[in-house]
Swiss-Prot record:
Receptor for thromboxane A2 (TXA2), a potent stimulator of platelet aggregation. The activity of this receptor is mediated by a G-protein that activates a phosphatidylinositol-calcium second messenger system. In the kidney, the binding of TXA2 to glomerular TP receptors causes intense vasoconstriction. Activates phospholipase C. The gene is TBXA2R. This is Thromboxane A2 receptor. GO terms for biological process: adenylate cyclase-activating G protein-coupled receptor signaling pathway; cellular response to lipopolysaccharide; G protein-coupled receptor signaling pathway; inflammatory response; negative regulation of cell migration involved in sprouting angiogenesis; positive regulation of angiogenesis; positive regulation of blood coagulation; positive regulation of blood pressure. One of its GO terms (cellular component) is nuclear speck. Disulfide bonds join 105-183. Interacts with RPGRIP1L. Interacts with PSMA3. Interacts with RACK1; the interaction regulates TBXA2R cell surface expression.
């Protein structure tokens, strides 16, 4: 409970914002348009994925399973959080009036963490899958690859949900954020707030860093095979180039959208003197920066499906005609196998 002398739940902090200021900041039309575009983009990507998964190889089916999990996560994230935010912007209700017990705030905090961290963890899982598929093509049974991919997606969801539930167990707190239309982790100086903020930002940052490292090795391996001595006979298949292009696009989008928010959270909870006063108040500058970084991060849910839609072979062939003229039945796996045998 914040020392504000009221009987409100622990999710309410002093924000000192007027109704007129909320109307200027919280536009229901912008929020609704943002959600509609995002939901339509993810539905389009899911429909394209449904067609692409028919008749594909085991390796490609495994990768498409991860993509399906990623797009589904983005779609559900926009649907759940968008419903709450658009409703608040349209009605301009006072959060403490409709949710004095903080149940809705805690729910939104959990889903914000869950749907924020899941795409980053899925990106790292996809990078690991492609790294093993390119550098160790025969290290895992192909028949079980799709089943294992779904199991990995489920494990990622479970890990993200477990992290999101920590504030309900006393590690960190979820509070209503400026301008009073959403809930997120608390950027306070208490040990639980600091630990939870650092854990979220570090897991997200490590996921992006791992994706960058593994994707760099995978691309370097593909380039080595492409320009090797046997390049004329054994080049990467179109599907392998397509998957790496999509994965690199997902990594770039995640880095641009999420790293600013993750760095801001870590810097704010470690700030000395603390950014939050003992009464639970942040400076208006800090509150606005958090809102801006959060809005940038939410663009990840719109851009992810378009990475898959635009980086398909049908589009890549228009940009690089050589993809449609060279043999498509050859793979880089024989050359990688030959190299490993020589070692």
């Amino acid at each position: 409970m914040w020392p504000n002398g009221s009987s409100l739940g622990p999710c309410f902090r002093p924000t000192n914002i007027t109704l007129e200021e909320r109307r200027l900041i919280a536009s229901p039309w912008f929020a609704a348009s943002f959600c509609v575009v995002g939901l339509a983009s993810n539905l389009l990507a899911l429909s394209v994925l449904a067609g692409a998964r028919q008749g594909g190889s085991h390796t490609r089916s495994s990768f498409l399973t991860f993509l399906c999990g990623l797009v589904l996560t983005d779609f559900l994230g926009l649907l759940v959080t968008g419903t709450i935010v658009v409703s608040q912007h349209a009605a301009l209700f006072e959060w403490h009036a409709v949710d004095p017990g903080c149940r809705l705030c805690r729910f939104m905090g959990v889903v914000m963490i869950f749907f924020g961290l899941s795409p980053l963890l899925l990106g790292a899982a996809m990078a690991s899958e492609r790294y093993l598929g390119i550098t160790r093509p025969f290290s895992r049974p192909a028949v079980a690859s799709q089943r294992r991919a779904w199991a990995t997606v489920g494990l990622v969801w479970a890990a993200a949900l477990a992290l999101g539930l920590l504030p309900l167990l006393g590690v960190g707190r979820y509070t209503v954020q400026y301008p009073g239309s959403w809930c997120f982790l608390t950027l306070g100086a208490e040990s639980g707030d600091v630990a939870f903020g650092l854990l979220f930002s570090m897991l997200g940052g490590l996921s992006v860093g791992l994706s960058f490292l593994l994707n760099t090795v995978s691309v370097a391996t593909l380039c080595h095979v492409y320009h090797g001595q046997e390049a004329a006979q054994q080049r990467p298949r179109d599907s392998e180039v397509e998957m790496m292009a999509q994965l690199l696009g997902i990594m770039v989008v995640a880095s641009v959208c999420w790293l600013p928010l993750l760095v801001f959270i870590a810097q704010t909870v470690l700030r000395n003197p603390p950014a939050m006063s003992p009464a639970g108040q942040l400076s208006r500058t800090t509150e606005k920066e958090l809102l801006i970084y959060l809005r940038v991060a939410t663009w990840n849910q719109i851009l992810d499906p378009w990475v898959y839609i635009l980086f398909r072979r049908a589009v890549l062939r228009r940009l690089q005609p050589r993809l449609s003229t060279r043999p498509r039945s050859l793979s880089l796996q024989p050359q990688l196998t030959q190299r490993s045998g020589l070692q």
